[in-house]
């Protein structure tokens, strides 16, 4: 069973592809696994925020990044929002932004 990776917008895709090299390599490696095995890679790779919102956890030499995503019925994994993490906890405003983007995406479908 194969999944597909979609992006909420061109901007989201560009932001992810402009991550520092080691974070981008980690993203490509993990999304390849997600395509083959599904979105639930488990900790430390993915985590759930509830309500169908998940995060892809990227760690590399240049730091830590997070990519929020959701899954759709048709084996689709939709990348919603990414950011470079600078604090121990995921900032509340980044979570709120990801939830809003997810709701917008669902309303557009």
Place the predicted regions along the sequence by residue.
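Conserved catalytic cores of phosphodiester-cleaving nucleases, focusing on short active-site segments
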Residues: 80
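Basic, Lys/Arg-enriched alpha-helical interface segments
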Residues: 1-64, 73-77, 86-109
């Amino acid at each position: 069973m194969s999944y597909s990776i979609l992006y909420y917008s061109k901007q989201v895709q560009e932001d992810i592809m402009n991550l520092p090299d080691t974070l981008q390599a980690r993203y490509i490696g993990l999304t390849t696994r997600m395509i083959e095995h599904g979105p639930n890679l488990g900790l430390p790779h993915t985590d759930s925020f509830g309500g169908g919102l998940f995060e892809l956890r990227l760690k590399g030499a240049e730091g830590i990044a997070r990519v929020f995503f959701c899954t759709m019925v048709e084996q689709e994994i939709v990348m919603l929002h990414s950011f470079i993490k600078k604090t121990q906890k995921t900032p509340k405003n980044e979570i709120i932004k990801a939830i809003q983007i997810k709701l917008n995406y669902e309303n557009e479908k």
